[in-house]
């Protein structure tokens, strides 16, 4: 499934009787077994240390970035039998163009002409930094202290078919249908008629 892993690791050993430096960089990528189920992962580690008698001071930084296609919707037995065992419904939308696919939709119980958005992904970056101090006070006692900071940022990207624009906080004059005079169009119950569009959304998160 075109899976590849590369890693580089360097280590200085003890330099000048006091200093050490270690670093590692890793990359993993795969197309995955499930269609549009690929992944791309990178990670790093850096560590610098100072040693002097009973004192140790160490700076550690590690983290990584992940981009993973969404492929955890699952599939029914009929969908796998008729669409193949690698079937993935993620990113599917209805279409009638010449490049569409004919698939079995078990939820509706019928064949449909659909296409797939290939970049429906989960994306996340995290960085961890640590400063570690260790002081040996005696044969029985050691004092240790650690300061740390973690930062994370991520989002998932999805194709939404026939989405209502007001659900995404579009202003009313864009989210609801209007006539030539700019008045809102209403249905038989007097409710404004929502504008629907195909769109790509990104839902974000950050953590500290």
Please tell me what each predicted stretch does.
Residues 56-132, 157-207:
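Acidic/polar loop-and-plug regions of large Gram-negative outer-membrane beta-barrel proteins
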Residues 2-29, 34-73, 129-136:
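Transmembrane beta-barrel wall of Gram-negative outer-membrane proteins
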Residues 1-11, 183, 203-208:
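Outer-membrane beta-barrel transmembrane domain signature of Gram-negative proteins
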Residues 37, 146-148, 158-161:
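Composition- and surface-driven signal marking solvent-exposed, interaction-prone regions
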């Amino acid at each position: 499934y075109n899976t590849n892993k590369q890693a580089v690791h360097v280590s200085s050993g003890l330099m000048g009787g006091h200093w050490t430096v270690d670093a590692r960089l890793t990359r993993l990528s795969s197309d995955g077994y499930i269609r549009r189920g690929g992944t791309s992962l990178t990670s790093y580690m850096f560590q610098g240390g100072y040693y002097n008698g009973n004192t140790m001071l160490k700076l550690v930084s590690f983290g990584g970035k992940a981009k993973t296609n969404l492929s955890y919707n699952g599939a029914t037995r009929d969908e796998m039998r008729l669409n193949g065992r690698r079937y993935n419904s993620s990113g599917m939308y209805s279409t009638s163009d010449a490049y569409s696919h004919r698939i079995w939709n078990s939820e509706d119980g019928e064949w449909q002409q659909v296409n797939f958005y290939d970049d429906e992904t989960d994306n996340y970056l995290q960085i961890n930094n640590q400063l570690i101090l260790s002081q040996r006070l005696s044969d029985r006692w050691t004092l240790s202290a650690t300061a740390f900071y973690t930062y994370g940022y991520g989002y998932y990207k999805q194709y939404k078919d026939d989405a209502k624009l007001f659900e995404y906080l579009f202003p009313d004059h864009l989210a609801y249908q209007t006539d030539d005079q700019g008045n809102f169009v209403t249905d038989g119950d007097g409710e404004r008629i929502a504008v629907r569009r195909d769109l790509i959304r990104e839902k974000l998160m950050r953590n500290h």
